[in-house]
Regions:
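Jelly-roll (double-stranded beta-helix
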Residues: 1-136, 141-195
Length: 195
């Protein structure tokens, strides 16, 4: 079935609860969702920049940018071509290219995760997305199991999974995993599909 929920029954937020409605810190929460419409022809990347305050971050927004407060920072998340840069701020990462179909409307769904050590997605094949999923790890580590191999990332690193890949995610190491997440999904479909 594809009820739009990630298979995280033991994880507060289920990746759908808005971060403003969070009752406890651990979990997966939506921080923003932005309809981008049809995307341009050039390859796209997820640009992650931080600013000293939210007002400055808001003033640096581009057409496909959102400002998110999370993990103690004021983030400017932007979907743009590789050469794009905001005025000022600190460049944290650029993840991509994000492979998408041209002339297809997409929505950028951003999430924040705080996952204790030892977390594993429910047994079974996991979930998939109708578009690429990208992570930037602020702290801790994660392991992503797919039929195409296992990927790992640790604090300061990013990870990218293409559209449609079945995946199951787990925490790696003994530190709480803190990450910001993007699912750039086809607007006509739920952002997540259980397998």
């Amino acid at each position: 079935g594809s009820d739009g929920r990630a298979r995280n029954p033991g994880l507060p937020g289920w990746c759908e609860t808005p971060v403003a409605d969070r009752k406890v810190e651990p979990g997966c929460y939506t921080t923003a969702s932005s309809e981008l419409g049809a995307v341009p022809i050039e390859p796209l990347y997820w640009h992650l920049d931080t600013f000293p305050d939210r007002t400055t971050a808001e003033s640096r927004r581009a057409a496909r940018s959102v400002v998110v407060d999370g993990h103690g920072k004021h983030w400017l998340f932007t979907i743009a071509e590789q050469a794009w840069r905001p005025v000022g701020g600190d460049r944290v990462a650029m993840v991509g290219p994000l492979v998408v179909d041209r002339d297809t409307p997409y929505t950028a769904r951003y999430m924040e995760t705080v996952i204790p050590p030892g977390f594993q997605e429910g047994r079974g094949p996991g979930h998939r997305h109708p578009g690429p999923e990208a992570w930037f790890l602020v702290a801790g580590g994660q392991c992503l199991e797919t039929p195409n191999g296992v990927m790992t990332a640790r604090a300061g690193q990013s990870m990218l999974a293409p559209e449609g890949w079945p995946m199951a995610i787990a925490s790696l190491g003994t530190e709480t995993r803190r990450a910001v997440v993007l699912v750039l999904h086809r607007s006509s479909q739920p952002y997540v599909q259980r397998i």
